[in-house]
From Swiss-Prot:
One of its GO terms (cellular component) is cytoplasm. This is Ribosomal RNA large subunit methyltransferase E. The active site is at residue 164. The lineage of its organism: Bacteria, Pseudomonadati, Pseudomonadota, Gammaproteobacteria, Vibrionales. Belongs to the class I-like SAM-binding methyltransferase superfamily. RNA methyltransferase RlmE family. PANTHER family: RIBOSOMAL RNA METHYLTRANSFERASE, RRNA METHYLTRANSFERASE 2, MITOCHONDRIAL. SUPFAM superfamilies: S-adenosyl-L-methionine-dependent methyltransferases (SSF53335). Its EC number is 2.1.1.166. GO terms for molecular function: rRNA (uridine-2'-O-)-methyltransferase activity. It is found in: Cytoplasm. HAMAP family: RNA_methyltr_E. S-adenosyl-L-methionine binds at residues 63, 65, 83, 99, 124.
Length: 209
């Protein structure tokens, strides 16, 4: 691909980004990313987050979901966040930087969490996309499997789970796996999710334990 094509593509992305009403609204409201509107819409429909809850936020950086979760759970609740990327501190959020796929990082995260005491696990994780679907989809599915494994280790009975999943190979099997573990499972495509994106959010409540 030529430099001109790359530059043109980058230019279009930047223009779309800065013209995006959700980007502008996030900046106006003091949130770190437009992704906050995805969890806000899920919350408005499904009421996952309540005062006093303990929440685990996977793939948290730059922190939009954690910001929103802290507002919902209040001073009596807690948010434990993890990402491979750095994240500026947020009051009320315990942040661990590291690769969630590494056992040492997972162990460090689990040390901050009491077993069976987490009310909500939420994951907005996504791999670095190469543009090659045959490579990207398995990477994405691996991450959502890890998020589901986290539920098995820390989620309280009747707890909730929301996870970003890319539609494609492995999606149907994963959805069935989630349905086996939770009483109610819904698929959401938030308004703020770009129409061309394959992403959807699985929202699962009533963890069977």
């Amino acid at each position: 691909m030529s430099k001109n094509k790359v530059s043109a593509s980058s230019g279009r992305w930047l223009k779309e980004h800065f013209d995006d009403k959700y980007v502008l609204e996030a900046q106006k409201r003091g949130y770190r990313s437009r992704a906050i509107f995805k969890i806000e819409e899920i919350q408005n429909k499904d009421k996952l987050l309540k005062p006093g809850m303990t929440v685990v936020d996977l793939g948290a950086a730059p922190g939009g979901w954690s910001q929103y979760a802290v507002e919902q759970v209040g001073d009596e609740g807690q948010v434990i966040a993890c990402d491979i990327l750095p994240m500026d501190s947020i009051a009320g959020v315990s942040f661990l930087q590291g690769d969630f796929r590494e056992e040492a990082v997972l162990d460090a995260l689990l040390e901050r969490i009491q077993p069976d005491m987490v009310d909500v696990v939420m994951s907005d994780m996504a791999p670095n996309m190469s543009g090659n679907l045959a490579v990207d989809q398995p990477r994405a599915m691996y991450l959502v499997e890890l998020a589901l494994d986290m539920c098995r280790q820390v989620l309280a009975p009747n707890g909730s789970f929301t996870v970003k999943v890319f539609q494609g190979e492995g999606f149907d099997q994963y959805l069935q796996e989630v349905r086996n573990m939770f009483k109610v499972v819904k698929i959401r495509k938030p308004d703020s999710s770009r129409a061309r994106s394959r992403e959807v959010y699985i929202v699962a409540t009533g963890y069977k334990g």
